[in-house]
Amino acid sequence: MAVNEFQVESNISPKQLNNQSVSLVIPRLTRDKIHNSMYYKVNLSNESLRGNTMVELLKVMIGAFGTIKGQNGHLHMMVLGGIEFKCILMKLIEIRPNFQQLNFLLNVKNENGFDSKYIIALLLVYARLQYYYLNGNNKNDDDENDLIKLFKVQLYKYSQHYFKLKSFPLQVDCFAHSYNEELCIIHIDELVDWLATQDHIWGIPLGKCQWNKIYNSDEESSSSESESNGDSEDDNDTSSES
């Protein structure tokens, strides 16, 4: 028997959802590429984060994806679907933020010129990828029902917004050696529509999902109106990213 016939993967998170490690929503080959990337090793390893916590990861997220209104481009020129994006998405999956943390980040108010639109996009992709299996059938599970309500409200809310984001084409895997696609500008409602209707994004499979059916529901519309009243200024932020 070959010595290497059975290999234990060292980068599997011990945290679980849906009776398996949270890491397994990302295919093994993609996980290996992410964990072997220089960006992950320098910025997102347990040692570099100085604590494998959401508080430490949030510092990286703000530095990587925070934008300043009135400036062209975001601070470190990261894009949706790129290597750095996938690395942070992977770390977010491994840490598995709780409901209170997700609720806070998805409803944070932009102040002093800071714009969280790339962070919002990251969290929407994370929710669709990590929590695809939620179905709401367990009426006694308040945590599950709270997550479903939060995700549906946020998807519907941003399906009605149109701010621009720099991105790899949604069907393109940045790790593929054969791609010749250039970066593009997408609107947040396009990203939401993709998450609601497609089974993959940037080369990552999206599990079959029930709570992402948002277009025929009045609940999300009424729930999101009160939350989006203070966010209408985002719709005016339609200058192209450079």
Curated annotation (Swiss-Prot):
> Which UniProt keyword terms apply here?
mRNA processing, mRNA splicing, Nucleus, Ribonucleoprotein, Spliceosome
Give the protein name, as stated in the record.
Pre-mRNA-splicing factor 38
Compartment(s): Nucleus
The family assignment reads:
Belongs to the PRP38 family.
Which InterPro entries does the UniProt entry name for this protein?
PRP38
| Protein task | Required for pre-mRNA splicing and maintenance of stable U6 small nuclear RNA levels. Implicated in the formation of stable and biologically active snRNP structures. As part of the U4/U6.U5 tri-snRNP particle, dispensible for spliceosome assembly, but required for conformational changes, which result in U4 snRNA release and the subsequent catalytic activation of the spliceosome.
Give the encoding gene's name: PRP38
Organism the protein comes from: Saccharomyces cerevisiae (strain ATCC 204508 / S288c)
Q: What is the effect of changing C87Y?
A: In PRP83-2; temperature-sensitive; blocks splicing of RPS17A after a 2 hour shift to the restrictive temperature of 37 degrees Celsius; spliceosome assembly arrested at the complex I stage
Assembly = Component of the U4/U6-U5 tri-snRNP complex composed of the U4, U6 and U5 snRNAs and at least PRP3, PRP4, PRP6, PRP8, PRP18, PRP31, PRP38, SNU13, SNU23, SNU66, SNU114, SPP381, SMB1, SMD1, SMD2, SMD3, SMX2, SMX3, LSM2, LSM3, LSM4, LSM5, LSM6, LSM7, LSM8, BRR2 and DIB1.
Q: Which domain of life is it from?
A: Eukaryota
Q: Where is this region: Disordered?
A: 217-242
Further information in the entry reads: Present with 2380 molecules/cell in log phase SD medium.
